Amino acid sequence: MASPLDQAIGLLIGIFHKYSGKEGDKHTLSKKELKELIQKELTIGSKLQDAEIVKLMDDLDRNKDQEVNFQEYITFLGALAMIYNEALKG
């Protein structure tokens, strides 16, 4: 039986692949796919304006290929986890 951490990692991977490849490369997120993922999977997503999502995409897209690959996605989740951790500390 998978541990809770194994399950969490599987969920993060599954969510990436749920949205990647709806258009174009199935191993990356386009701007449209990233926007949909953020809006549907993150509580803060519905509060973000389009311009904020575009800025986030630009920040995440380290290699500037106009798509977010899995490594860039995981980097985003790591940064988000750090923000959540700080918020929980007080």
Swiss-Prot record:
GO terms for molecular function: calcium ion binding; calcium-dependent protein binding; S100 protein binding. Residues 12-47, 48-83 form the EF-hand domain. It is a peripheral membrane protein. The keyword Calcium applies. The modification Phosphoserine is found at S46. The modification N6-succinyllysine is found at K47. Pfam families: S_100 (PF01023). Signal peptide: none annotated. It is found in: Nucleus envelope; Cytoplasm; Cell membrane. Keywords: Acetylation, Calcium, Cell membrane, Cytoplasm, Membrane, Metal-binding, Nucleus, Phosphoprotein, Repeat. The modification N6-acetyllysine is found at K40, K47. One of its GO terms (cellular component) is extracellular space. Ca(2+) 1 binds at T28, E33. Ca(2+) 2 binds at D61, N63, D65, E67, E72. The keyword Membrane applies. InterPro entries: EF-hand-dom_pair (IPR011992), EF_Hand_1_Ca_BS (IPR018247), EF_hand_dom (IPR002048), S-100A6 (IPR034118), S100/CaBP7/8-like_CS (IPR001751), S100_Ca-bd_sub (IPR013787). May function as calcium sensor and modulator, contributing to cellular calcium signaling. May function by interacting with other proteins, such as TPR-containing proteins, and indirectly play a role in many physiological processes such as the reorganization of the actin cytoskeleton and in cell motility. Binds 2 calcium ions. Calcium binding is cooperative. Homodimer; head to tail assembly of 2 subunits. Interacts with CACYBP in a calcium-dependent manner. Interacts with ANXA2 and ANXA11 (via N-terminus). Interacts with SUGT1. Interacts with TP53; has higher affinity for TP53 that is phosphorylated on its N-terminal domain, and lower affinity for TP53 that is phosphorylated on its C-terminal domain. Interacts with tropomyosin. Interacts with FKBP4. Interacts with PPP5C (via TPR repeats); the interaction is calcium-dependent and modulates PPP5C activity. Interacts with TPPP; this interaction inhibits TPPP dimerization. This is Protein S100-A6.
